[in-house]
Amino acid sequence: MATYIVSGLCFLLLLLAPVSAAAQGKPPGEGKGKLVISLQDAIKRTLAVSNRIKESRAGVDASLSLKGQADAARWAQIDANLFGGPSTKNELRSDTGIIDSKTTTSDIKVNGVFGRAVIRVVQPLYTFNKIGSFREAASRGVRVSQAAVGQQASEVVLQVKQAYYGALLASDTRAFLKGLLKDVRDSLKTTERRVEAGSAAATLGDVYQLRSFAARIEKGIADAGEGHTIAMDGLRTLMQLEPGVQFKLVDRNLTAAAVALRRVEDYEQTADEIRPEFVQLREGIKAREALVEAAVADRYPIIFAAALADVAGATNRDRSRVPIITDPLMHTQGGFFLGLNWHFDFGITEGRIDEARAEHMQLIYKKDFADLGIPFQVRKAYEEFQTATANIKNTKDAYRNARRWLVTAVANLDLGIGEVVQLTQAFILYIEFRVENFRAIHAQRIALANLDFATGEAVRSFTVQ
C-alpha cells in the first residue's frame, strides 16, 4: 500500500510541475494605487509602453528618412564653394605682341587678398531608372518596417496572454489544493483518533501516509503560489508598473473560451493576408528586386543638366579683357550645359549586382520556408485548441466522478468501514483530474492565443503610429 501511495504522490508532483512553468509568461506598469486590470487592459497598456515596439517604431522613422532621401534624389543638387586668401602681384603686358608678366613664379610678391565663389547646380535628367528603383526600394522598406512593428506587437500580446492566463491557472490550482488540504487534515484527525483509541480500522502506517500526503499537497500549494507570483510579476514588468503599485486581475477564475472556430483553411488564408512576417517578406522581396534593378543601372551613365557660376575678385588684380585668358583670382564666368557621368570599374559594379541578386534570393528562400512553416503553426494551434476543448469536457466528467468517489471514501472512513488506501486513491485521482481540467482550460486559452498570433489577428486593429 505504501508503494502505491509513493507512486501516486510522485505522479501528483509531475502533474503540478507545469503550473509554475505555465505561469512564466513575459512581462508591463505605473504609479500608485490599487488597479483592477482585465486582459484587454493589460494588452493596451503593454502595447502603449513596450520598449520593443518603440524600438520598431524608430525603425519606421529611419525607413521614412531613407525614403525621403531617395525621393529627393530626383531634384537638383547644389554645391557652393566659397574661399579666399592672399593674392600675389601679377601684371600682364604685351609690348611685343606676346602676352607675358612682369612678375615670375620665382619672384612672388603678396600685396593683396582675393575671394572666390563657385556654385554648381546639377539636375539629373535620365538615370536608366536608378533613382526610380531606389525610391521603390525605400517605399517597400517603409512597409517592411511597419510590418516589423506589427510583429513585435503580436509577440507582446502573446506574452501578456501567457502571463495573464498563467496567473489564473496558478491561482485556481492553489485555491483548489488549499480546499483539498482541509479535507486531508480532517481525515488525518479521524485516523489519529482511531489509532489513539486502539481501533483496528486504522494503523500508524495510515497516519504516516496521510501526513505525507498532506505535506505533498502543501508543497503543491507553495509551487502554485510561486507560479502565481512569477506570472503577476511578469505582468507588472510587461506593463512597466512601478514596484509599489498594487493590482489584481478582473477575472477570478480561469474559464474556458466559448469560441466556434472557422475552418482551418480560413485561418491559413488570414495568416497569408495579414501575418506581419508574410507582409515583411512580400514587401522585402519587392524591395530587393528594386535594389537589383538599381545595381544594374550602375552599368549605365547618368545624363544631367547643370548650371555653373564662378566669380572671383582680388584687391591687386585688374580684370582681364583678353578672352583666352582667365585670371583665377579675378574673373566672372558661368553657363548652362548638358552632361553625362559614366563610371567604369573592373568588377566592382558586377559584384554589387551579384550581391543584390543573392540577397534577393535569400528572401525568396525565406518566404518559401514561411509558406510551409506558418500554415503548420496555424494548424498546430488549431488542433491544440480542438484537443484542449475536448479535454475540458473529459476531465470535467472525470474529476466530478472522482469527487463522488472521494466523498464516499471519506464517509466510509468516518463510519469506520473504509480504508485509508481507498481514501488516498480517491484523493490522488481527484487531484489528477481536477488539475488536468485546469490545465486543459489553460491549454485551450493558450492555443487560442497562439492561433491569433499565428494568423496575425492578435494585432489586426493595432496601428503602427
Residue ranges with predicted function:
Residues 3, 37, 155-270, 384, ...:
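Periplasmic alpha-helical coiled-coil/stalk elements that build and connect Gram-negative outer-membrane
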Residues 7-17:
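Bacterial N-terminal signal peptides
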Residues 11, 20-32, 88, 415, ...:
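Acidic, low-complexity, intrinsically disordered peripheral segments
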Residues 23-84, 89, 125, 201-207, ...:
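Bacterial Sec-pathway N-terminal export signals of envelope proteins
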Residues 25-35, 81-123, 251-261, 293, ...:
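Small/polar, glycine/serine/threonine/aspartate-rich low-complexity segments that form flexible
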Residues 44-54, 61-77, 111, 118-137, ...:
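A glycine-/polar-enriched beta->alpha junction
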Residues 55-70, 152, 156-177, 186, ...:
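Amphipathic alpha-helical coiled-coil segments
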